[in-house]
Amino acid sequence: MVAGIYDIFNHICEQYFSGEDDNTSDYIAEALMKSVIHSSLIAVNNPEDYEARSNIMWSATWALNTLISKGKLTDWMVHMLGQSAGAYTDATHGMKLAAVSLPYYRHILPYGLKKFVRFAIEVWKVNPHGKSDDEIAKEGLMKMEEWMKKLRY
């Protein structure tokens, strides 16, 4: 289940981190990420929770049908890196994405700082008060890593 959650989340991220867009697709992507975060923490602790699992699957439908990418240029580099890692390991698809996503996002952070700031504030509820944009963005990625660890990454 956890590998699938990482795959779903990265499908959303790779459509979301596409520039400094401020459109309906971004708002939907943020809501989907929040839903996946919320529901995944419940489902991992109680795999029998039908509501949590069904919300994850509903989010997966949106993540995979590319409606949230309309009007955007998208970046599927995390998936490409994950597939490349597949040549050297038999890890599941989602776990490969988990392994490469944070290093990749940290690498591209300077090029998409405004979007990573928005991600930190809107998705991870980072308090921006008294912090630089760089600090806010890095805190968002740190919170993403903390969530991944809670899922037993």
Each model region followed by its residue ranges:
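Phosphate/diphosphate-binding glycine-rich loops and adjacent basic-rich segments that engage nucleotide
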Residues: 1
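Active-site segments that bind and position negatively charged phosphate/pyrophosphate groups
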Residues: 15-142
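Conserved FAD-binding catalytic core of PHBH/FMO-like flavoproteins
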Residues: 4-6
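Conserved phosphate-interacting/catalytic interface
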Residues: 9
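Conserved core segment of the aminotransferase class I/II
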Residues: 12
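Short, intrinsically disordered, charge-balanced linker/junction segments flanking boundaries
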Residues: 146-153
